[in-house]
Design a protein with these regions (language model features):
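Conserved Rossmann-fold NAD(P)-dependent oxidoreductase catalytic core, especially the SDR/UDP-sugar
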Residues: 81, 85, 90-156
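A conserved pocket-lining segment of Rossmann-fold NAD(P)-dependent short-chain dehydrogenase/reductase
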Residues: 90, 147-152, 195-222
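Flexible, glycine-rich beta-alpha linker
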Residues: 129-130, 178-199
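Active-site Tyr-X1-5-Lys
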Residues: 150-180
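NAD(P)H-binding glycine-rich loop region in Rossmannoid oxidoreductase-like domains
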Residues: 36-38, 47-103
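N-terminal Rossmann NAD(P)H-binding glycine-rich loop of SDR-like oxidoreductase domains
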Residues: 2-27, 32
């Protein structure tokens, strides 16, 4: 029997690449989508990329709704939580980003703890580390946090910071801190798996090209 992984956000850019890597590594993947209308496209995309989609399942989950979270982890050994809101333009109300990011992380962690999931991986961001510090030439580590109250902290950075802090708090309270792994990448670049329009393509079409800066914390998606 293949180990089963619950992967939230499989229809996203990063989630799709994670799903492909898991399937190619022999795992059974239970991917979450907001509605099942996306399932056929995800299945076709991963199949075209060479994955064995006979081990691909789908479950409907909403970051702001409790429905389905408990059953989504049944028979799963691992959970990878990559679903989190990301928008082209920062909303006027920061809670439009913060609420689903934090609430979705809370639901994922609580479901994992209740089901005794062996290992939880959270996709956070360098944005949860780098903002609100005095001076520009500091060496930052996992011990450092972005300051949510700093005027230099964007809505997105605040949402990622608070969501990651929620994950650590819940796993610590459950006595499971050592079973949580968090990655904090910078901008993730790489090829699209399908012909959908990612954020960069939409900005380009809008006449706002976004060339990569000379110095930044980029990561290639295959890393």
């Amino acid at each position: 029997m293949f180990d089963r992984v619950l992967l939230t956000g499989i229809s996203g850019f990063l989630g799709g690449h994670i799903g492909l890597a898991l399937l190619n590594a022999g795992y059974t993947v239970r991917g979450s989508v907001r509605n099942l209308s996306k399932a056929d496209k995800v299945r076709a995309t991963l199949s075209a990329a060479g994955a064995d989609v006979s081990r691909l399942e789908f479950v409907v989950l909403d970051l702001l709704d409790d429905t389905g979270w408990g059953s989504s982890v049944v028979d799963c050994r691992y959970l990878i939580h990559s679903a989190s809101p990301f928008v082209l333009r920062a909303p006027a109300d920061e809670m439009a980003l913060i609420r689903p990011a934090v609430a979705g992380t809370r639901r994922a962690i609580m479901a994992a703890v209740a089901a005794h999931i062996e290992r939880v991986v959270l996709t956070s961001s360098i944005a949860a580390i780098q903002y609100g510090h005095a001076g520009d030439e500091q060496v930052l580590s996992e011990a450092d946090w972005t300051s949510p109250s700093s005027p230099n902290t964007s809505h997105y950075a605040r949402s990622k910071t608070l969501a990651e802090q929620e994950a650590w708090a819940l796993m610590t309270a459950a006595g499971r801190r050592g079973d949580l792994a968090v990655i904090n990448p910078g901008v993730i670049l790489g090829p699209l798996l399908d012909n959908g329009l990612g954020t960069s393509a939409l900005l380009e079409m809008a006449g706002e090209p976004t060339p990569a800066p000379l110095v930044h914390a980029h990561r290639y998606v295959f890393d």
